[in-house]
A protein has these predicted regions:
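C-terminal lobe/tail of nucleotide-utilizing enzymes
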Residues: 133-215
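Conserved nucleotide-binding/hydrolysis micro-motifs of P-loop NTPases
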Residues: 16-18, 54, 64-65, 95, ...
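Inter-motif core of Ras-like GTPase G domains
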Residues: 97-118
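Glycine-rich phosphate-binding loop used to anchor ATP phosphates in small-molecule kinases
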Residues: 82-99
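P-loop/Walker-type NTP enzyme "switch/lid" segment
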Residues: 11-83, 182-183
Protein backbone atom coordinates (compact mmCIF):
# COMPACT_ATOMS: atom_id res chain seq x y z
CA UNK A 1 0.00 0.00 0.00
CA UNK A 2 2.92 2.36 0.59
CA UNK A 3 4.10 1.78 -2.97
CA UNK A 4 0.62 2.56 -4.32
CA UNK A 5 0.64 5.91 -2.51
CA UNK A 6 3.69 7.36 -4.26
CA UNK A 7 6.24 5.94 -1.84
CA UNK A 8 9.26 4.23 -3.35
CA UNK A 9 9.65 0.99 -1.42
CA UNK A 10 12.65 -1.35 -1.42
CA UNK A 11 12.20 -4.89 -0.11
CA UNK A 12 15.43 -6.57 0.95
CA UNK A 13 15.27 -10.36 1.16
CA UNK A 14 17.24 -11.49 4.22
CA UNK A 15 16.40 -15.18 3.93
CA UNK A 16 19.85 -16.31 2.78
CA UNK A 17 19.65 -19.52 0.78
CA UNK A 18 15.86 -19.85 0.61
CA UNK A 19 15.27 -16.45 -1.05
CA UNK A 20 11.49 -16.27 -1.13
CA UNK A 21 10.60 -12.68 -2.03
CA UNK A 22 11.44 -13.05 -5.73
CA UNK A 23 8.84 -15.83 -5.90
CA UNK A 24 6.22 -13.83 -4.03
CA UNK A 25 6.75 -10.84 -6.31
CA UNK A 26 6.83 -12.95 -9.47
CA UNK A 27 10.30 -11.78 -10.55
CA UNK A 28 12.35 -14.97 -10.14
CA UNK A 29 13.33 -15.12 -13.81
CA UNK A 30 14.74 -11.59 -13.61
CA UNK A 31 16.93 -12.24 -10.57
CA UNK A 32 20.61 -11.91 -11.49
CA UNK A 33 22.42 -10.13 -8.66
CA UNK A 34 21.83 -9.90 -4.91
CA UNK A 35 22.90 -7.81 -1.93
CA UNK A 36 25.83 -10.19 -1.40
CA UNK A 37 27.25 -8.98 -4.71
CA UNK A 38 26.90 -5.40 -3.49
CA UNK A 39 28.62 -6.15 -0.18
CA UNK A 40 31.50 -7.81 -2.05
CA UNK A 41 31.68 -4.92 -4.55
CA UNK A 42 31.05 -7.30 -7.44
CA UNK A 43 28.39 -5.07 -8.97
CA UNK A 44 27.10 -1.51 -8.78
CA UNK A 45 24.44 -1.34 -6.07
CA UNK A 46 21.82 -0.04 -8.52
CA UNK A 47 22.14 -3.07 -10.81
CA UNK A 48 21.25 -5.49 -8.01
CA UNK A 49 17.75 -4.03 -7.62
CA UNK A 50 14.77 -5.47 -9.51
CA UNK A 51 11.82 -3.26 -10.40
CA UNK A 52 8.67 -5.20 -9.44
CA UNK A 53 6.36 -2.42 -10.65
CA UNK A 54 4.17 0.19 -8.96
CA UNK A 55 7.02 1.78 -6.98
CA UNK A 56 8.00 -1.59 -5.48
CA UNK A 57 11.58 -2.84 -5.80
CA UNK A 58 13.45 -5.94 -4.65
CA UNK A 59 17.02 -6.52 -3.53
CA UNK A 60 17.38 -10.34 -3.52
CA UNK A 61 19.23 -12.41 -0.94
CA UNK A 62 22.41 -14.36 -1.76
CA UNK A 63 22.37 -18.14 -2.17
CA UNK A 64 25.04 -18.81 0.46
CA UNK A 65 26.31 -17.07 3.55
CA UNK A 66 29.79 -15.54 3.46
CA UNK A 67 32.08 -14.33 6.24
CA UNK A 68 32.23 -11.07 4.30
CA UNK A 69 28.63 -10.38 5.30
CA UNK A 70 29.51 -8.53 8.48
CA UNK A 71 27.07 -6.11 10.18
CA UNK A 72 29.33 -3.21 9.24
CA UNK A 73 29.56 -4.08 5.55
CA UNK A 74 25.88 -4.90 5.29
CA UNK A 75 24.91 -1.61 6.95
CA UNK A 76 27.10 0.21 4.44
CA UNK A 77 25.29 -1.64 1.66
CA UNK A 78 21.85 -0.57 2.90
CA UNK A 79 23.04 2.99 3.45
CA UNK A 80 23.65 3.33 -0.30
CA UNK A 81 19.95 2.87 -1.03
CA UNK A 82 18.52 5.32 1.49
CA UNK A 83 18.65 8.32 -0.81
CA UNK A 84 16.70 6.47 -3.53
CA UNK A 85 13.80 5.08 -1.47
CA UNK A 86 11.20 6.34 1.00
CA UNK A 87 11.01 3.00 2.83
CA UNK A 88 13.43 0.08 3.03
CA UNK A 89 12.12 -3.17 4.53
CA UNK A 90 14.58 -5.89 5.50
CA UNK A 91 12.46 -9.05 5.40
CA UNK A 92 14.06 -11.42 7.89
CA UNK A 93 13.16 -15.11 8.29
CA UNK A 94 11.70 -16.64 11.41
CA UNK A 95 14.32 -17.41 14.03
CA UNK A 96 17.46 -15.55 14.96
CA UNK A 97 19.76 -16.57 12.15
CA UNK A 98 22.39 -14.42 10.47
CA UNK A 99 19.76 -12.62 8.38
CA UNK A 100 17.96 -11.36 11.48
CA UNK A 101 21.14 -10.15 13.18
CA UNK A 102 22.35 -8.33 10.06
CA UNK A 103 18.93 -6.72 9.72
CA UNK A 104 18.84 -5.56 13.33
CA UNK A 105 22.23 -3.87 13.06
CA UNK A 106 21.19 -2.03 9.89
CA UNK A 107 17.68 -1.00 11.01
CA UNK A 108 16.24 2.09 12.64
CA UNK A 109 13.00 0.34 13.56
CA UNK A 110 11.56 -3.17 13.55
CA UNK A 111 8.15 -4.61 12.65
CA UNK A 112 7.52 -8.09 14.02
CA UNK A 113 4.89 -10.26 12.38
CA UNK A 114 3.15 -12.85 14.54
CA UNK A 115 0.11 -15.08 14.33
CA UNK A 116 -2.07 -15.86 17.34
CA UNK A 117 -0.63 -19.29 18.16
CA UNK A 118 1.55 -19.58 21.25
CA UNK A 119 4.67 -20.72 19.39
CA UNK A 120 4.55 -17.70 17.09
CA UNK A 121 3.97 -15.34 20.02
CA UNK A 122 6.94 -16.78 21.89
CA UNK A 123 9.13 -16.38 18.79
CA UNK A 124 7.90 -12.80 18.36
CA UNK A 125 8.73 -12.01 21.98
CA UNK A 126 12.21 -13.44 21.55
CA UNK A 127 12.73 -11.48 18.33
CA UNK A 128 11.57 -8.28 20.03
CA UNK A 129 14.00 -8.80 22.90
CA UNK A 130 16.91 -9.49 20.58
CA UNK A 131 16.09 -6.57 18.29
CA UNK A 132 16.39 -4.26 21.28
CA UNK A 133 19.61 -5.95 22.39
CA UNK A 134 21.02 -5.14 18.96
CA UNK A 135 20.16 -1.46 19.20
CA UNK A 136 16.65 -1.24 17.70
CA UNK A 137 14.51 0.77 20.12
CA UNK A 138 11.41 1.26 17.95
CA UNK A 139 9.80 -2.19 17.77
CA UNK A 140 6.22 -2.69 16.60
CA UNK A 141 3.91 -5.65 16.21
CA UNK A 142 1.59 -6.81 13.43
CA UNK A 143 -0.79 -9.66 14.25
CA UNK A 144 -1.30 -11.75 11.12
CA UNK A 145 -4.07 -14.18 10.03
CA UNK A 146 -6.50 -12.95 12.67
CA UNK A 147 -9.95 -14.55 12.47
CA UNK A 148 -12.60 -12.73 14.51
CA UNK A 149 -14.91 -15.73 14.64
CA UNK A 150 -12.25 -18.19 15.75
CA UNK A 151 -10.48 -15.77 18.08
CA UNK A 152 -13.43 -14.26 19.96
CA UNK A 153 -11.92 -15.12 23.32
CA UNK A 154 -8.48 -13.84 22.45
CA UNK A 155 -7.37 -10.60 24.06
CA UNK A 156 -5.12 -8.72 21.64
CA UNK A 157 -3.73 -6.74 24.57
CA UNK A 158 -2.36 -9.98 26.01
CA UNK A 159 -0.47 -10.63 22.77
CA UNK A 160 0.95 -7.10 22.87
CA UNK A 161 2.05 -7.48 26.50
CA UNK A 162 3.65 -10.87 25.87
CA UNK A 163 5.60 -9.73 22.82
CA UNK A 164 6.48 -6.40 24.39
CA UNK A 165 5.95 -4.23 21.32
CA UNK A 166 3.51 -1.52 20.25
CA UNK A 167 0.71 -2.69 17.99
CA UNK A 168 1.02 -1.47 14.41
CA UNK A 169 -1.90 -3.35 12.92
CA UNK A 170 -3.93 -6.53 12.56
CA UNK A 171 -4.22 -8.41 9.26
CA UNK A 172 -7.34 -10.55 8.82
CA UNK A 173 -7.21 -14.19 7.83
CA UNK A 174 -8.04 -13.80 4.14
CA UNK A 175 -7.87 -16.45 1.43
CA UNK A 176 -7.62 -13.67 -1.16
CA UNK A 177 -4.29 -12.56 0.27
CA UNK A 178 -2.69 -15.98 0.35
CA UNK A 179 -4.07 -17.11 -3.01
CA UNK A 180 -2.57 -14.03 -4.64
CA UNK A 181 0.78 -14.37 -2.89
CA UNK A 182 1.13 -18.06 -3.70
CA UNK A 183 0.36 -17.31 -7.32
CA UNK A 184 3.16 -14.77 -7.56
CA UNK A 185 0.75 -11.84 -7.71
CA UNK A 186 0.74 -8.91 -5.31
CA UNK A 187 -2.80 -8.86 -3.84
CA UNK A 188 -3.55 -5.15 -4.27
CA UNK A 189 -7.30 -5.76 -4.54
CA UNK A 190 -8.29 -8.03 -1.68
CA UNK A 191 -10.46 -7.99 1.42
CA UNK A 192 -7.45 -7.26 3.63
CA UNK A 193 -6.61 -4.02 1.86
CA UNK A 194 -8.17 -1.81 4.54
CA UNK A 195 -5.86 -3.37 7.15
CA UNK A 196 -2.81 -2.80 4.96
CA UNK A 197 -3.91 0.78 4.34
CA UNK A 198 -4.19 1.51 8.07
CA UNK A 199 -0.75 0.02 8.68
CA UNK A 200 0.81 2.05 5.88
CA UNK A 201 -0.72 5.27 7.20
CA UNK A 202 0.65 4.58 10.67
CA UNK A 203 4.09 3.96 9.18
CA UNK A 204 3.82 7.37 7.53
CA UNK A 205 3.12 8.97 10.91
CA UNK A 206 -0.66 9.34 10.73
CA UNK A 207 -2.63 8.84 13.93
CA UNK A 208 -5.01 6.05 12.93
CA UNK A 209 -7.01 4.80 15.95
CA UNK A 210 -7.59 1.13 16.66
CA UNK A 211 -11.29 0.27 16.64
CA UNK A 212 -12.89 -2.99 17.71
CA UNK A 213 -14.78 -3.32 14.41
CA UNK A 214 -11.47 -3.35 12.56
CA UNK A 215 -10.00 -6.21 14.60
Amino acid sequence: MLALHDKRVLLVDMDIGVRSLDILLGVSERTVYNWGDVVKNNVDYRKAVIDAGRNLFLLPAPIDFSEEYTPEKFSECIEKYKKDFDFIFLDSPAGLESGFLLSAKASESCVILSTRDNISIRAASYACENARKNGVSDVRLVVNKFNKKLHKKINVDEIIDTVGARLLGIIPDSQDIYAGVNGGDIPYDCKGNSAFLRISKRLCGENIPFRAKNL
